[in-house]
Amino acid sequence: MQNTSFDNESDYSDDSDFASASETENRIGLTVPLELAGGRLDAVLAKLLPDYSRSRLTSWIKEGAVIVNDKPSQPKDKMIGGEQICVTVRPSEENLAFVPEPMALDIVYEDDTVIVVNKPAGLVVHPAAGNWTGTLLNGLLAHCPELSQVPRAGIVHRLDKETSGLMVVAKTLPAQNSLVRQLQERTVKRIYRAVANGIVPFDGKIETQIGRDPHNRLKMAVVKFGGKPAVTHVKVLERYLTHSYIECSLETGRTHQIRVHMREANHPLAADPVYGNPRHPCGDTVKEAVKSLGARQALHAYRLSFTHPESGETVSFEAPIPNDIYHLLSVLRLEAGLDSSLSNEEEWQDKFGADDDDDWNEDDYDVEVVYVRE
């Protein structure tokens, strides 16, 4: 089965040790089996301790936390079989950051099984280098202390720091397993609203491979080889003079997927600090509205649907468009001479509310393309 959202570094990273908060320092005794004779110590440990990344095991070896036959060793040391290994398991920095921090959370829904939260732009989901405190995870642990007993504190997918919107968090291990399985099977429906530069010509599907940008390892890009399949469905809600209001549905959940795909389609998201075009031509009033978004791109996880882990029923949630994006839309409508009387969220919902058309989930193309009409 192909992993989708759960293997995405933005939603979830298989390359990082994302353990539960209960992990503590302890020792593990191992005997190198004869079938692994001839292998390097780091490679042997990676096979014997698959729950830990090879990079983490290598760092333990270099730190002297791995003893082979009562002696410190090096990652490249060859094993002959039968060696006695003692590994001191040390909590990762991420794990040490699993501490509750009270913060105001916009809880959209909560029961004994799941929490649905509306994440604001600017909030990091999970502790990592440069953001060891003040993350959504820290706030969730304060709100629901029992999450400390759930692997990964119940988080099964992520949003970029500067993307706002809906996330679901599992409160129990069975619920987490259910949600992960749904993400892997692509049955979780995620709909985003965004403002894109330019006039998006038609509704369509963007289907590519996404991987690390070979010229900038801090960015993602559409690549021909070595990437992961990524599919985004785009629906145009409204067109203005210099921008378009769009709705994006995800089949997959790659890192920065919508942002990368819209850039590749020559319609990057407004105000995107990484993939956007700060010189996109537009009127002064619109420029000010875009500037007022600050560091965040005009992207919001608007709707989330999944099968409830306990009841088995399909549940759907929506989060109103944030004020900063709403202001930009109002300015764009006014400039375009459109009805500017849509003064509140209810009126916007009546005009642009999500429908229940599931046609986006039909995989009727099997080509490497950038943008095709549906």
Swiss-Prot record:
Classification via Pfam families: PseudoU_synth_2 (PF00849), S4 (PF01479)
One Gene Ontology CC term in the entry: cytoplasm
Domain of life from the UniProt record: Bacteria
S4 RNA-binding domain: residues covered: 39-112
Molecular-function annotations in GO: 23S rRNA pseudouridine(1911/1915/1917) synthase activity; pseudouridine synthase activity; RNA binding
Acidic residues bias locations: 8-17
Main location: cytoplasm
EC number: 5.4.99.23
Protein's UniProt keywords contain Cytoplasm: yes
Annotated region described as Disordered, given as residue ranges: 1-20
Keywords noted in UniProt: Cytoplasm, Isomerase, RNA-binding, rRNA processing
Location relative to the cell: Cytoplasm
Function: Responsible for synthesis of pseudouridine from uracil at positions 1911, 1915 and 1917 in 23S ribosomal RNA.
Protein name, entry field: Ribosomal large subunit pseudouridine synthase D
Organism expressing this protein natively: Neisseria meningitidis serogroup B (strain ATCC BAA-335 / MC58)
Taxonomic classification: Bacteria, Pseudomonadati, Pseudomonadota, Betaproteobacteria, Neisseriales
